[in-house]
Amino acid sequence: MSTRRSSTRADSTTKRPASPNSTPNAALGIFVAIARQILFIDARKVALFYLAFVTVLSFIESRIELDSTYYLVQKHSVLNQYGVKMGWFWTLVIVGPFIWFSSKAHNRRDRDQPIVDVCRLGVGTACWYFSVQFFHKVLALTSMCDKGRTLTRAQCSEKEGVWTPGYDISGHCFLMIYSILIITEEAIAYRHYQQVTDAVHQMDGDREEHDRLTRCIQYFFVAMLFLHAFWFKQIIISVLYYHIFIEEILGAVAAVVCWFVTYRMLYPAGFLASPIRRTVGRK
């Protein structure tokens, strides 16, 4: 009898209370499951889809005149002013923390690796900035005034000339598709996250911190799903209501080129590091 009591006490002392962060959250679990279905699609397929999608929508726009009086499709709408125009900001504040926390979980003993991984967003920011500057340069070079080719738009207006706008490559289309491709590439860190990090943290022991980190990663993973969905909707509006066929296509192609050069050429070649693709067998 005493032996049974002592063994019961021993068992009770070895059991640790469950971490509040490990408590199942049904709503979060549903969104994580949906996000896995969308964000784990191969980036090459995503790139091809959006190239085809923009092409088809641009063709439709060139054949059909759409009603542009709806509030949500106007440039001064809240979603355009604080969503699309601040698009790269939202990419940084959502994808950045996901990369950071995922890298911390995967590389628990390497404090420098999260910094290296986040630097990929720095490269993406440079690609976005210089691409947009290039688009502006193309617009300036292809626009002209009938009073003189070297005149600016303001100077043309002063001379009462006729201003003919040039090719305004869609910076919004570029930004949104490039952001989607970055999200798709970086989301892969969560594919085998649970199996790999569980094995790592079983050795290190700090289960409560691991659960807290996991919950944080899941929130940003779901946030990337919502950002992807928002970009999808805004791409439709941008293509159907703004720019012309060639401007939208060039914006989409530029986004795919930037993604391919960075994620499929530079990172695999050793420039910084590719997104985390570890499996249980590769720790």
Curated annotation (Swiss-Prot):
Q: Where is the composition biased (Low complexity)?
A: 1-11
One Pfam match, by short name?
Answer: FIT
Report the membrane topology from the UniProt record.
Multi-pass membrane protein
Tell me the compartments it is located in: Endoplasmic reticulum membrane
Q: Which InterPro entries match?
A: FIT (IPR019388), FITM1/2 (IPR046401)
Q: Which example biological process does GO assign this protein?
A: lipid droplet formation
Provide the Gene Ontology terms for cellular component. endoplasmic reticulum membrane
Q: Which residues lie on this side of the membrane: Lumenal?
A: 61-81, 142-168
- Residues in coiled coil: none
Which intervals lie on the Cytoplasmic side per UniProt? 1-39, 103-120, 190-219, 262-283
Stated name of the protein: Acyl-coenzyme A diphosphatase FITM2
Q: Which organism is it from?
A: Caenorhabditis elegans
